[in-house]
Amino acid sequence: YWNILHLFGKIKIGIKKASADGIPIRSISVDTWGVDYAYLDQNGDLLYQPHCYRDNRMGQYEETFYKKISKEALFEETGVQPACINTVLQLFADLQEKPHLARVAERVLFMPDLINYLLSGVLSSEYTIASSSGLLNINSQTWSDSVFETLEIPKKWFGEVIQGGRVLRSLSPRITQELKIEPFDVIAGAGHDTAAAVLAIPYASEQPTAFISCGTWSLVGLESPNPVTSQEALAANLTNEGCFDGRYRILKNTTGLWIIQELQRDWRLQGEDISFAEMVTLAREVTNNRSWINPNDAIFAAPGDMEAKVKESCHMTNQPVPQSKGEVVRVVLESLAFAYRQTVEQIESLTGQKIEQIHMVGGGIRADVSRTQHERRALTRYLVGGPWW
């Protein structure tokens, strides 16, 4: 579960500190990760803490889910790549385990909409965050009647889809009184964090430019006025999500620094606190990497024992097994770079656009600028980095 009340408490602390700097705050907007959500009752109160998408409850219901609606039909209707973590499958799993939710839940809010609600008291469903749920029709950009009816998900749980940029209301009086600050507007911005990141990219060229938003996940894609919902796109694991301006982000959700983060966490538990920059330095000292992994393999999805998983993957594919920490990190970083390259080439093939430039953004490129050397060698295109946050 996500401890949303703790997270919201930290948001209020951040607002209070920003106000204390003496700079008048005019507005606030929220973006978060996708697919997760919360249930509200008829009084507008949380029924329980929101599930985390890494919860394993969905797996046991996948077979039943896809008997009701095929992956092909779901992708054609919503443009969203079928995945166990998707909102639509999470909701289906919830209803199998807790059928009473259909009766007691009055509203479902995605995470940024939930935080906006806690800030302003206004219920909303912003487009970019809704677009990753598997519940929207890809063409109309409104809720898909066929998905709701086929899966027997109550449509009453969701309000009208709104485009980003709408002022919801001023910060609630309860919060202004609690924090002893002046009110300011709460705006429904680009609620999906990747949509927000892509909106901030200062593209340096008018030529077709791909983006890579680097973090725990890496989102590799291209902005387009039209979605791609062919069976070839489905087979390539591409997805279509919304942009702030109503266009589409044709992208692949790939593993990002998750494996690196888990290696760092495991080593810290073993008594070695190694920074990201130090990990990159260790990798740079490896002169000849001869092994690669598929960073999107299910073996790497769950936390824990990540070094052993990297070594096992190399062993199972008859490759040299990395021994030192630097070799392990080098295998992971170069494998990520080649996964990015494959995705860019798939997008080129399916859209008919030749991508000349790639713009990398996000916190994942901040660990060490030299990290992008791996991407630069693998991607064979002009590479631009920044901003990061």
Residue ranges of each PLM-predicted region?
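A conserved helix-loop-beta module that forms one wall/lid of the active-site cleft
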Residues: 145, 151-164
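N-terminal glycine/serine-rich phosphate-binding loop of ATP-dependent small-molecule kinases
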Residues: 1-48, 60, 64, 76, ...
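Short glycine-rich phosphate-binding loop at a beta-alpha junction
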Residues: 24-32, 107-108, 160-161, 352-363
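Hinge/lid segment of periplasmic solute-binding proteins
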Residues: 56-70
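Active-site core segments that coordinate phosphate-bearing ligands/cofactors
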Residues: 66-79, 89-122, 135-141, 145, ...
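Short beta-strand-loop/turn "lid" adjacent to the catalytic site in phosphate-handling enzymes
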Residues: 20-53, 78-87, 116-137, 160-163, ...
